[in-house]
């Protein structure tokens, strides 16, 4: 956080538990929505106490990080809950394993259609940033979706 504070640059607060080796074992939640939101609230509060500017905070609910398929889908269905945090929201679901589970597709490069569906959903919820692999396809679908949702 010293770098963020020193250079006054934007950064992403991402919800996750553990690390890449053990995060899948840490996916037990009483209520994934309230647990993730509460965790993000605490992370934001801690960063603000370190004199980090509010305008530099971007929030990511951490799709795929210490969450199973049902948790990821529950978060996607309730993106409006995270918009209520009043910070820009980033969703990074591109080619994630849960998309592969839904599509029965093991090859991540063959999951772009699922990513496109999520990008459309993000447009509907006015999500600020989507992290994607196939930029051209997502740009095109978001251009159409934005015209539909924003007139």
Sequence positions of predicted segments:
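Phosphate/pyrophosphate-binding loops at sites that engage ATP/ADP/AMP, CoA/4′-phosphopantetheine
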Residues: 41-56
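Active-site metal-binding loops of divalent metal-dependent hydrolases
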Residues: 63
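Active-site-adjacent loop and "lid" segments of alpha/beta metabolic enzymes
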Residues: 1-45, 66-151
């Amino acid at each position: 956080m010293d770098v963020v504070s020193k250079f006054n640059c934007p950064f992403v607060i991402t919800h996750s538990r553990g690390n890449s080796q053990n995060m899948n074992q840490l996916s037990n939640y009483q209520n994934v929505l309230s647990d993730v939101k509460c965790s993000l609230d605490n992370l934001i509060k801690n960063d603000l106490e370190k004199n980090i500017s509010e305008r530099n905070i971007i929030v990511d609910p951490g799709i795929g990080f210490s969450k199973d398929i049902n948790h990821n889908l529950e978060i996607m269905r309730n993106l409006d809950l995270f918009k209520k945090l009043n910070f820009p929201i980033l969703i990074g679901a591109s080619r994630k394993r849960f998309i592969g589970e839904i599509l029965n597709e093991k090859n991540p490069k063959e999951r772009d259609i699922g990513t496109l569906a999520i990008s459309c959903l993000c447009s509907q919820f006015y999500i600020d940033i989507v992290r994607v692999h196939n930029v051209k396809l997502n740009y095109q679908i978001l251009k159409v979706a934005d015209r539909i949702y924003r007139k």
